[in-house]
Amino acid sequence: MDIRILKPSDLPLIQHANLENLPENYFLKYYLYHALSWPQLSFVAVDVARPKKTPYDYPKIVGYVLAKMEEEPTDGVQHGHITSLSVMRTHRRLGIAEKLMRQSQLAMVESFGAHYVSLHVRVSNGAAIHLYKDTLGFQNEKTEKAYYADGEDAYSMRLDLSSIREQIQDEADSEGVDEGEAVGDVGSDPAKKKTKKKAAGNGEKDKRKVKVGRGLGVGELVEKNEAKQP
């Protein structure tokens, strides 16, 4: 199974997956709007185990997450929103939905600095509620009456993304740490450098212990005189 960014060529396939699995359906241009406006945030799950019969075969998309950033958040806080999540019935209980969600959440923080992500779910959709609440850690903020076209209520849920923000910051900090040692005079202490030159000017020997390779048949430390004799 391969999780990758949604491409415009995938749109008819994710629309098919949506029609197969969800009662909330959208026009193709709505998917295109997401793909063009926030290309970093939507992902598809591709069944790579299915061999292609020809080079022109479409990939077998078995799941997708359609996401966006709220353009004018009412609370003034930059955050993302999950518009739609779907996995084909033949590929459920494999952790695909969780992977799609986590990938989208990470992209929201990396690309847009999102502070949290929101979504709506039918109050009768127990499997989805379990995924969002128990697996991913979403919190139920409120119930919106008659949110869906058929009159069913929806839970408005939200997940704080501060842990992802901290993880990204920690990784950035660790990449910036130089654990190596100075080579030659680069990065050396100027005071020690002057002392070394002064000792050489007074005719003192500058000795250093070096390890000689085993290939030469010597396994001890020897002293090497590096001072130039006049």
Q: Could you say what each language-model-derived stretch is?
A:
Residues 88-90, 94, 123-124:
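Active-site acidic-Proline motif in GNAT/NAT acetyltransferases
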Residues 8-90, 101-112, 160-166, 181-185, ...:
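Acetyl-CoA-dependent GNAT
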Residues 166-176:
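Short, charged, solvent-exposed linker or helix-capping segments at domain edges/interfaces
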Residues 82, 117-121:
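Conserved hydrophobic beta-strand within the GNAT/NAT acetyltransferase core sheet
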Residues 98, 110, 115, 123-155:
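Conserved active-site alpha-helix within GNAT-family acetyltransferase domains
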Residues 174-177, 181-184, 188:
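Intrinsically disordered, low-complexity serine/threonine-rich segments
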Residues 3-6:
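Charged, low-complexity intrinsically disordered segments
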